[in-house]
């Protein structure tokens, strides 16, 4: 996370992004400098007084990460359900404190129906606990795997909500910088499920006209201007939305290669197509929507507002393709790659 290397990525087609992503995204460098027991990660004015257990009944474990565990919680006074993310401070390296603080600052700032909300924070000598909105439907990635297909109508519903959330984030001066199905959480089932944008670990608050320069994100979804090492802006999020839309509609990514270097070459030239028969039943409106996002020049990319006004998202059902099973024959391959990433991850992790 935060940089790219030259490890080999998976070969072949069609393929989910998971195998490439796991091989291409290095783990953060571990240092010996840890957070002291008396060192605060969050700002004092942000911390709720008392212990989290004084206010919440702690329930079952929902998932586990590298240095965190997520449990279901119930507010004692209201019976409201929440997700309690316990971060064990001794595993948080000093070099990552600012990143964690930035993530908390952003989550405190945002309030939108398509963005995961942070309710309050508790901090003890051993743990930082984030009280978050509970999302029970899991990652969008798993929906793709489990269902094996999205109708164009279902894909459109997902993309519309992602664009609405991103438009809000951009209006608040926030670039997410790591949009992917794993960071899109689902509430409910079927074509009317609600989408929540999550994981702001790589997000950045920027001023009007300010350019960003840090190379970060997940290789399969990263925009060309990030790979070149130059400056970029929030248009990188729109490229990622284009890639996500492409995957939803056919079951495999627009860019695939036998190595990460070859993958980057394809991304840098925006070298992709809409192969048959996978795209036979997908409407031209959907393809045009993608072409306006997966475009090399960021200045030519549609903004989130333009996407919401696009005929594919704003039009009637007549503007979309048939409700045919778009990619059920890719389900088996996706399940295989998904097995590699099952490690107790949580929908709120």
UniProtKB/Swiss-Prot annotation:
Highest rank taxon of the organism: Eukaryota
Residue stretches of biased makeup (Low complexity): 16-33
Keywords, in A-Z order: ATP-binding, Kinase, Nucleotide-binding, Serine/threonine-protein kinase, Transferase
Domain Protein kinase per the UniProt entry, residue ranges: 56-313
Alphabetical list of SUPFAM superfamilies matching this protein: Protein kinase-like (PK-like)
Regulation: Does not have a calmodulin-binding domain.
Gene Ontology molecular function, alphabetical: ATP binding; myosin light chain kinase activity; protein serine/threonine kinase activity
Catalysis: reaction(s): L-seryl-[myosin light chain] + ATP = O-phospho-L-seryl-[myosin light chain] + ADP + H(+); L-threonyl-[myosin light chain] + ATP = O-phospho-L-threonyl-[myosin light chain] + ADP + H(+)
Annotated spans, Disordered: 1-33
Gene3D superfamilies to which the protein is assigned, alphabetical: Phosphorylase Kinase, domain 1 (3.30.200.20), Transferase(Phosphotransferase) domain 1 (1.10.510.10)
Binding site for ATP: 62-70, 85
Pfam families in the record: Pkinase
EC number: 2.7.11.18
One GO cellular component term: cytoplasm
Enzyme class: transferase
One example of a Gene Ontology biological process annotation: signal transduction
Family, per entry: Belongs to the protein kinase superfamily. CAMK Ser/Thr protein kinase family. CaMK subfamily.
Function, in words: May phosphorylate a specific serine in the N-terminus of a myosin light chain.
Official protein name in the record: Probable myosin light chain kinase DDB_G0275057
Annotated organism of origin: Dictyostelium discoideum
């Amino acid at each position: 996370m935060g940089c790219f290397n030259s490890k080999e990525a998976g070969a072949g087609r069609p393929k989910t992004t998971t195998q490439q992503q796991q091989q291409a995204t290095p783990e953060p460098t571990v240092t010996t400098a840890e957070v002291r027991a008396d060192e605060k990660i969050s700002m004092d004015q942000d911390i709720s007084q008392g212990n989290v257990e004084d206010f919440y009944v702690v329930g079952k474990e929902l998932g586990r990460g590298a240095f965190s565990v997520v449990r279901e919680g119930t507010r004692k006074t209201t019976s409201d359900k929440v997700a309690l993310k316990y971060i064990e401070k001794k595993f948080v390296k000093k070099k990552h404190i600012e990143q964690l603080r930035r993530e908390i600052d952003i989550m405190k700032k945002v309030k939108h129906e398509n963005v995961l909300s942070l309710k309050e924070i508790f901090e003890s000598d051993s743990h930082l606990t984030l009280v978050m909105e509970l999302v029970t439907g899991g990652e969008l990635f798993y929906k793709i795997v489990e269902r094996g297909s999205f109708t164009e109508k279902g894909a459109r519903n997902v993309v519309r909500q992602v664009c609405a959330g991103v438009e809000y984030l951009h209006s608040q001066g926030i670039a997410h910088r790591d949009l992917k199905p794993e960071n899109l959480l689902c509430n409910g089932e079927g074509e009317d499920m609600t989408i929540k944008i999550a994981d702001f670990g790589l997000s950045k608050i920027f001023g009007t006209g300010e350019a960003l320069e840090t190379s970060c994100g997940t290789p399969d979804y990263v925009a060309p201007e990030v790979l070149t090492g130059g400056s970029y802006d929030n248009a990188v999020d729109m490229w990622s939305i284009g890639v996500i839309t492409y995957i939803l509609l056919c079951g495999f990514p627009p860019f695939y290669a036998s190595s990460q270097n070859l993958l980057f070459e394809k991304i840098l030239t925006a070298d992709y197509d809409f192969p048959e028969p996978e795209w036979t039943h997908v409407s031209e409106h959907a393809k045009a929507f993608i072409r306006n996002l997966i475009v090399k020049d960021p200045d030519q990319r549609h903004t989130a507002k333009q996407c919401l006004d696009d005929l594919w998202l704003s039009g009637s059902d007549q503007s979309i393709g048939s409700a045919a099973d778009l990619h059920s024959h890719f389900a088996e391959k996706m399940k295989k790659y998904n097995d590699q990433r099952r490690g107790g991850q949580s929908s709120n992790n």
